[in-house]
């Protein structure tokens, strides 16, 4: 999945809308909308949005399998 698709999936699972996510990270709804439309998003912005939903970015060896409830970002 693309990074923005992962964020959208987590938002859906948690019932968090764009406005609520924006409030959590201190940006306007339009900024969240624009970020989620991008194919590429900076690691900093990705981490910021994930942290607001109690997720974190972890780097592991590529040979390690993705477990249930984990995501793998495609480039």
Give the ranges of each region predicted by the language model.
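Key DNA-contacting residues within the recognition helix of helix-turn-helix
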Residues: 8, 33-34, 47
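Residues that mark the N-terminal boundary/hinge immediately upstream of a DNA-recognition element
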Residues: 6, 17, 42-45
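Short, charged recognition helix plus adjacent turn
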Residues: 34, 58-75
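A short, Lys/Arg-rich alpha-helix, primarily the initiator
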Residues: 1-14
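Residues within the alpha-helical elements of helix-turn-helix
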Residues: 13, 24, 52
């Amino acid at each position: 999945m693309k990074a923005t698709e992962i964020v959208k999936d987590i938002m859906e699972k948690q019932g968090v809308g764009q406005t609520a996510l924006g409030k959590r990270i201190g940006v306007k709804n339009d900024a969240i909308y624009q970020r989620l439309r991008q194919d590429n998003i900076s690691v900093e912005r990705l981490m910021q949005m994930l942290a607001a939903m109690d997720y974190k970015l972890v780097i592991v060896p590529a040979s390690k399998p993705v477990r249930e409830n984990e995501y793998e970002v495609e480039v």
